[in-house]
């Protein structure tokens, strides 16, 4: 949808949700520039499994890759990240 389409939908919103989110960081960044509403990102099960399979195949370092995938959403403008990896990410952040 174009920016004009979604802007009329946010009038009474408490937050904006982007899901799936990993492939839509450009949308998150545009939303961040356009609104003061909190932006929530939901890494859906398919995105989580894509990361887990990359780790299992040796294509992605678990700690660095999982952490970067989630921190990149924050850099794009997300205020809240909903993820199946929440416990693991919390552990990684605590160890940093």
Residue ranges and their predicted role:
Residues 1-11:
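Single conserved hydrophobic/aromatic residue that forms the stacking wall/gate
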Residues 20-41, 87-96:
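Active-site-adjacent beta->alpha loops and helix N-cap segments on the catalytic face
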Residues 13, 23-26, 45-52:
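Active-site pocket-lining segment
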Residues 13-22, 81-85:
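Catalytic beta/alpha-barrel core
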Residues 1-2, 30, 71:
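Short, flexible, glycine/charge-rich loop motifs used to bind or transfer phosphoryl groups or to couple energy/partner
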Residues 33-76, 95:
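Active-site-adjacent loop and "lid" segments of alpha/beta metabolic enzymes
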């Amino acid at each position: 949808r174009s920016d004009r389409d979604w802007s009329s939908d946010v009038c009474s919103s408490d937050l904006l949700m982007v899901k799936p989110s990993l492939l839509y960081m450009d949308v998150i960044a545009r939303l961040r520039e356009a609104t003061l509403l909190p932006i929530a990102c939901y890494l859906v099960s398919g995105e989580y499994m894509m990361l887990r399979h990359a780790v299992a195949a040796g294509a992605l370092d678990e700690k660095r890759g999982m952490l970067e995938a989630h921190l990149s959403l924050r850099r794009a403008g997300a205020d809240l990240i909903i993820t199946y990896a929440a416990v693991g990410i919390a552990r990684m952040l605590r160890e940093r």
